[in-house]
Amino acid sequence: MNYIELKHYLKNAEAIDDFLINNGVKKLDIDNSKNSFINYYEEYLNYYDFKIVKKDLVKVDTSYIKTPARTNNQNHSWYELLYRCIHGDSYKSKANISDHRLLKLLTNLTKMSLEDLKNLYQDGKSNLSLYDFNVFYRDGQPPIYIGINDGTHRIIMAKILGIDYVYTDNVQVYEYNKFKHDVFKEMKKAIKVFKDFLNQSEVFKLSADSTHIKVDVNINSYTCIDQFFYDVSPLDFNKNVESYREYIYFLHFYLKVFKEVEDAYKNSFNVYKHLPLRLLEFMLDSSSNFHLQNIYKHKSEFLRHVFY
């Protein structure tokens, strides 16, 4: 049976689960593949340090494998990736797999026993058995293997069939760095707190591109030249964690300044709720932009004019 015939058969004659069970796959393994969801652990590259590339042949328990090599399959179960090859993917977000490649692998069950297929997956020699991985180690926790390079469809099928282990002779090893993780968490929290403030502020707003801060008063809008928020590259964060500690201080410092301005604005007499442009001269640098430092340097003067 070729993959086209198998797809038609599974779509019209026999349910996928029945086909798998009738060919020796345990129901428990099928259920596990339905309840195990792909997670790329993309944050890990921020605070796990690269150590070494190992080329020795190593056995890998498939329960430690959390993703196939191809990206954009996040939050799908392993089973769903097979299901959508047969029944279509309109019921959920798109996946990054090739239907015919996955189904061609499934046709092996029509040509050999599950036991023979498992032996190929677990012999450490065949194409079905060898994979490349990133592995993340943290004391007291199981290792996490992330597929890289190729082998996407082979490892999906291995997870569905209940293959116990595969092998790797190319694994990039990463180790947990608690200090970097703490800084990363602190940065995320500082960004969230600042953005929550901006969402409810009457004076300060986030720019359309979510990177700069604006002052909106009356019908006028002024954009801060200094950039506040960035797309953080894991590689950059991991190598320059000290500079991100300075960034956290920057966020804390100016959040305090902005809150003082905001509080003064809210507590001023109503007539000052619509500030005349001359009061903004303390912070504005041009007709449409201002420097962040001007808010801090002239904060007391600005606040005094808000009140009087």
Residue ranges with predicted function:
Residues 2, 22, 26-47, 51-67, ...:
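Surface-exposed, charge/polar-rich loops and edge strands
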Residues 2-147:
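Short alpha-helix boundary/capping and kink motifs at helix termini
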Residues 126-186:
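A short, basic-hydrophobic beta/loop patch
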